[in-house]
């Protein structure tokens, strides 16, 4: 699973997921399913905000990354992917600027057009069950919830899906592709079932022992762009360059 994640997600997303797991004291070598889930969630959050801007009239518009008007205000502020201290700093700044009610839990995005925080969910189960779990945890009508599944289903607060159909279709297609790629590698069942995950972990550990040399070499690969992209991500003036450059899963 770890190899799959490193092959199928942008290196920047992988790095952010690694930092998140380290912050919570989790070992990605053991919690490989969580590693994959975090990367998937991060990518959905990025794709959710891709190309969406607000023009001078306050209207939401879609602009491709090569468009010269890309200096327009981003519609969404991405909170997910930052360390907790920085994330809460961003949330507090938004609340002070917009007058929005401070959420009890860290949300994933802020929508400047609708003036609301958004909680994004990606589930391997039934969307309505996961939605209810999220709603019960958050217990706030101010935070908008939007759930996606790997089967193409979605559910949102008051059936308000925020994005246009094409943008949501991109997310659904990507999730379906991830599912297919996992299935082709025999990883999907373990990703869905904790019991199967334990079996897969034993296989992975055994495989790592047999070919430790090659895996160590692969795990150390770095992208020259990371040092350039990181400040772009942490700075509020991030661009669509990173978010539009997601790597496609290589064929098995």
From Swiss-Prot:
Keyword annotations of the record: Decay of host mRNAs by virus, Eukaryotic host gene expression shutoff by virus, Host cytoplasm, Host gene expression shutoff by virus, Host mRNA suppression by virus, Host nucleus, Host-virus interaction
GO term, biological process aspect, one: viral RNA genome replication
Site positions for Important for efficient shutoff activity and nuclear localization: 195, 198-199
Pfam families linked to this entry: Flu_PA
Entry annotated with the keyword Cytoplasm: no
Similarity comment text for this entry: Belongs to the influenza viruses PA-X family.
Designated name of the protein: Protein PA-X
Gene: PA
């Amino acid at each position: 699973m770890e190899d799959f994640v490193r092959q199928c997600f942008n290196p920047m997303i992988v790095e952010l997921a690694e930092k998140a797991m380290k912050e919570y004291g989790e070992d990605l070598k053991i919690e490989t399913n969580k590693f994959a889930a975090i990367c998937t969630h991060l990518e959905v959050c990025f794709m959710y905000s891709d190309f969406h801007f607000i023009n001078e009239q306050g209207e939401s518009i879609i602009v491709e990354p090569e468009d010269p008007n890309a200096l327009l205000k981003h519609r969404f502020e991405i909170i997910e992917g930052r360390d907790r201290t920085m994330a809460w700093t961003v949330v507090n700044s938004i609340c002070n600027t917009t007058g929005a009610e401070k959420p009890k839990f860290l949300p994933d995005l802020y929508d400047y057009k609708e003036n609301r925080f958004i909680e994004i969910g990606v589930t391997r189960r039934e969307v309505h069950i996961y939605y209810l779990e999220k709603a019960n945890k958050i217990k706030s009508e101010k935070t908008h919830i939007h759930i996606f599944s790997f089967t193409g289903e979605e559910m949102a607060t008051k059936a308000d899906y925020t994005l246009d159909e094409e943008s949501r279709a991109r997310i659904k297609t990507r999730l379906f592709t991830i599912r297919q790629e996992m299935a082709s590698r025999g990883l999907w069942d373990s990703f869905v079932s904790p019991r199967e995950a334990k079996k897969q972990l034993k296989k992975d550990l055994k495989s790592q022992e047999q070919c430790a040399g090659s895996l160590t070499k692969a795990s150390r690969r770095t992208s020259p762009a990371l040092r350039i992209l990181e400040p772009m991500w942490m700075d509020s003036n991030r661009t669509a360059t990173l978010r539009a450059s997601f790597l496609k899963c290589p064929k098995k």
